Amino acid sequence: MSSAIASRRYAAALLDVAEDSGVVEQVDTDLEMISATIADSHDLVVMLKSPLIKGDTKAKALKAVFHGMLNEKTLLFIDLICRKKRADHLPQMVEEYKALRDERSGLINVDVNSAVKLEDEQARELINSLATYTGKKVRARLALDEKLLGGVTVKIGDTIIDGSVRHQLDMLRVALTADV
């Protein structure tokens, strides 16, 4: 089984358990802390990826690092993935968990690049329009793209909506040269 499929399955199982137990917020917080700690610690990354370190040793080490900080369900999850020799996929499982949680709550992440900084009112209108378009709640990441001549580009999952001036000029060029 590929690591992506396994990560998604483990993440889905953890989310199911968290929802059934009513501890989704606590598990969210736990996973954020685990993710940040692993990202900041080269030693933890090496330990998690090492095939020479046994699963129960990895579980004990993680429990020692996060002693008294994690919810019981999160601790059981860590123990499970260590015993199943999947601890090296923990960062991917955290990302899959976040994606599944957002999906289940009807939230979608959108990347908006603009040539100039959008005013607050413009950003609100754009987010409201995207929410109407997608039928979901929108979490927008706004960024400046100095390569754009003007306008905006919006990335929703695998879909790109290109409202940039460059794109409009390219479309105009194609239309004008098609008639010749």
UniProtKB/Swiss-Prot annotation:
Gene3D superfamilies: N-terminal domain of the delta subunit of the F1F0-ATP synthase. GO terms for molecular function: proton-transporting ATP synthase activity, rotational mechanism. Keywords: ATP synthesis, Cell inner membrane, Cell membrane, CF(1), Hydrogen ion transport, Ion transport, Membrane, Transport. It comes from the Bacteria. The keyword Transport applies. It is a peripheral membrane protein. GO terms for cellular component: plasma membrane; proton-transporting ATP synthase complex. It holds the Pfam family OSCP. F-type ATPases have 2 components, F(1) - the catalytic core - and F(0) - the membrane proton channel. F(1) has five subunits: alpha(3), beta(3), gamma(1), delta(1), epsilon(1). F(0) has three main subunits: a(1), b(2) and c(10-14). The alpha and beta chains form an alternating ring which encloses part of the gamma chain. F(1) is attached to F(0) by a central stalk formed by the gamma and epsilon chains, while a peripheral stalk is formed by the delta and b chains. HAMAP family: ATP_synth_delta_bact. F(1)F(0) ATP synthase produces ATP from ADP in the presence of a proton or sodium gradient. F-type ATPases consist of two structural domains, F(1) containing the extramembraneous catalytic core and F(0) containing the membrane proton channel, linked together by a central stalk and a peripheral stalk. During catalysis, ATP synthesis in the catalytic domain of F(1) is coupled via a rotary mechanism of the central stalk subunits to proton translocation. Belongs to the ATPase delta chain family. This is ATP synthase subunit delta. It comes from Prosthecochloris aestuarii (strain DSM 271 / SK 413). The gene is atpH.
